[in-house]
Structures are given as C-alpha cells and as structure tokens.
Amino acid sequence: MGTKKNILLGTISIIHSNWLPYAVGCLISHCKSIDQVNQRYHFHEPIYKHKPVTEYHTVLANTDILGLTCYVWNQSYNDELAAYYKSINPAGIVVYGGPQVPENQLAKISYDDKRSWLDTSIAGLGEIAFSEWLLDLPFSNSTLTTMPTPYTDGVFDSILATGEKFKVSFETNRGCPYSCAFCDWGGQSRSKLTKFNVDDVYSTIAKIYDYKNIVELEILDANFGILKQDIDIVQAMIDNQNLKDNYLRISYSGIAKNGSKNLPVILEKIFDNIPIDQRNLKISFQTHTPEVLANINRSNIDNSRLAPLILEYKNKNIPTTSEMIIALPGETAHSWLRTLDYNFHTLGIDYVRTYFLHLVANIDMATPEYQQQHGIQTKTIAIGHQQFEIIHRCNSYNQDELVRMFDYHWFYHTLVNTNLIKNNINNIYKDTLRFFAQLDDMPVLKSLVERNRSLVRNIFSDEPVTTLTNKHHQRFFSASMRTDDIVVILENQIAVAEELSAFVQQPLEVEWLSDNPLSADATIT
C-alpha cells in the first residue's frame, strides 16, 4: 500500500466563525467507517473559518484533495479558496458538494464549466456518493440509513479542545416529505424521511453536553416533532442538561410543518425545562394568501389546531413568532397586508419575522418551467463574498408593487414589532393604509419611509447585479430587514412621539430604551 493521500474538507461559515462544520464532519465520519477509505486516505482537521485564503496556505500545500461544501452564502469564498489552492498545488484535486451543486445535469455542466479550478462536483446527499468517488466506484444513489456520528467519532475533538465557544448542529432524521417550491429540503432525492437509530442520537447528545464550551445546539431536522421519538430526544437533552449542569441554547431549523400530535408535548418539555430567555414558539407560515400557498406547493397548519396551541402558550406568557417570506410569486401588496393583518388579529402572533426570498439550486422555483409559468425575472445581490439570486419581477408584482409591499412591511416591523404602537392598533389593515395616507404629516417617519423606499428600489432594480456595500443596507438584506431606523427613532424621541400621538389620536405612552438596538428583534419599549 502506497502513501495515503491527504484530504482537507471544509464547510465555511461566512457570518458565524464558531459553527462546527457538521456537513463535512458527516462525510469524514462515514468515510472513516470504511476500511478501504482508511487504507488510502488521511483526513486533515476540517476547516470552517472565513479568513483570508492565504492563511490556509500551510495546510493546502499538504493537501491532495480539497473538498468544500457549497451554499449560496459561501460559494464565492469557496471559489476563491479553491482557485488559490490550485495556484499553489496545480496537481491537487478540487471537489465540490452541497446544496449549491445543481442536480439537473445541464445546470451541473454549466456550474462546473464556469470554474476552471474545479475537477468534479457531487450533487445530492453526500456521504455515500463521496465515499464511492474516493474509491472509484459507480454512484449507487443509495440513501444513507446510518446516522453519521462525527461527535462521538472524535472528528471535532481537536477543534473543541481549543476551548473556544462553539455552536453545533446535528440531525436526528433526514429528508422532508413536503416539496415547497422555495425550499431544497424536499425534492426527488430528499423527499424520503429517514429515521436514524435513536441510540446514536442519544450518544451524540451526551457527547455534545460534555463540552462546556459548546453554547448552542441546533437540531437540523426539517420537521422536528414529526416522529414520536422526538419527544424522547428532547427529554434526553433535558436530562443531559440537568445532569451535567450545562444549559445550552437550543434551536430548531424546522418544526413539523402541518402540526403533529407530538408537538404540544415537545413544546411543553422545552418551555418547562429550558431557561426563560430561550422560550419562544416559532411557527413558519411564509404567507397566508391561498393563491400564493398553491403557487409554492405548501399548506399551513390548520387554524383549528394552531389557535388553541397559541392560546395555551399565551396563557403561560410564552411569546409566539411567525416566520414569513416576503414577495413570493403571486403575492401583491394588498395580499401581503392581509397576511400581516391575519397574523396580528386572527392568530395573535407576538412578533413577525420576515425574510427575503432567495433562489437556490435544486428548488422548483429555480427551474425554467416554474419561472416561465409565473413570469419570474431574477437578479443577483452581492454582499462581499456572498451572492444571492432574488426575484425582482413576476406576474403579480413589479418594482412599484414591491415598494408598496415593503412599505406595509416597514410599518409593521418598525412600529408594531417594536411595541411602539402595538397597543394602539385597532385594525392592522386599515391603520396601515391610514398611516401612509397621513405620511406627509409625519416628517421624521416620512424620511425613514422614503429612505426605505430608495433602498428597496435599488435592491429590486433591473440591473443584473446590485452590490450592497453600506453596512446598514447589508444588514437590511441579509439579517434584520431594517437599517438603523430604530436608532433614528430613539434619537428623535420627542418628534416621533408627537407624530405617532397624532396618528393614533391619543398620547403615546412609551418607556424608551436607553440604548440603540440594531438587531432584527429590537424593540423600543
């Protein structure tokens, strides 16, 4: 047997430098379970930090194969890193995987051909396909049935031993039975729900809770709570938390989409046992517009099941947050305002968190057929190393309609989400329209609205690529969907209070915050 080849795998996080690289950790864990791979290859410690590519020079110079997990947010950086690797190691091999690699064969050829430094890319679920590629075996398109266990296999031991604070993630199952048009969690290769051995899940949880420098744990399941075993998994986290006196922040990528009889039990355990600052009922709706839900192949939790759940947690003073996507195909300014109104009055949602619609590879919405059907025109937003494809026109909206849609969002996000006039609102729909009809009488707030309109027009302009360099504009697009509006309001408290008092037709009683928050969840009172 000759000298082993060195493999360097990386899942680079652009914004968060302390997320352990779970995706490539799974590849390493799976590959190390195969004797033939161990005989031929050695794996370097996986990389995960976003830093100047030259700082990876030493390890790259000693690498035969560089494998990178590609997402929409790190594709540009991965390209820079891979090109640099080829410049210092021309004989080295670059392989890409991850959600950004197209599964459509023609799109994949185009993706590969644009990158002269790329030797191969592997689409779809990665562990089995990557090991087959390493062993020169034909791709079997097999589905992984055994849970990768990078934590208990020691893949991350050397990284965790540094003592830095880390956020970690893992799956208890894989796949999604739904196929929402905007999401790549479902689809042909990922629509089957694979349940992993629960003992492996328990061992992983126990290992994670052994580390006091792990501060946050995210469950990556698309529909946590869909399986009965999820109740026991939550209990295992609670037991480890109490046994080891290690109170991690717990988050979930996705809660069971259409409700589940297991969900109330799971939420009860979470809310009764996790520290108070971590308690929040988060529900993903995207929209409440029936035509739009049909366009995106999605159905929301039935209100008859949802309303009692929300009421139960309101009675326990547990806030509810709804997650929405603005400007889905079929949405209009009017329908979006109706959606906000429904959240507030019918469901009693405490906070509405809204996201931009990004198009990624391997979703229905990115296919030519879907885009032709809905009259979709796309463009690119560039922020540093990150590039995002967005829709800037479709059958239901043009730029002017988008400006009105974002006007209504601005009103809700700036004045209602912040608690500024939440208690003075009688009817979200009517009060929003009345606010903009009276906007000329509110000079400070009008200046913020006009500034917001200008930014929205810039983002959704017809130019093929718009680069955002202003930090507030970047935050608006990629994080909070607001600039520094809250800061400006706090700096002009007296004038804003007078303007809003006239609008709500009663004195505005506000206990202003002493600092100037910029976060997406910032409140004023």
Kindly give the residue locations of the regions a language model identified.
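Radical SAM [4Fe-4S] cluster-binding motif and immediate context
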Residues: 151-315, 326
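Acidic, low-complexity intrinsically disordered segments
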Residues: 2-211
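Conserved C-terminal portion of the radical SAM core fold
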Residues: 65-67, 202, 208-220, 244-251, ...
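Hydrophobic positions in alpha-helices of CheY-like receiver
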Residues: 31, 84-88, 237, 313, ...
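Short, hinge-like loop/turn segments at secondary-structure boundaries
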Residues: 111-116, 138-140, 236, 339-340, ...
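Conserved strand-to-helix beginnings and helix N-cap segments that scaffold or border functional pockets
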Residues: 20-24, 78-79, 195, 230-234, ...
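Short aromatic-enriched loop/helix-cap "lid" or pocket-rim segments at secondary-structure transitions
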Residues: 107-109, 134-135, 230-231, 265, ...
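Radical SAM enzyme core and accessory elements
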Residues: 2-12, 36-41, 50, 58-64, ...
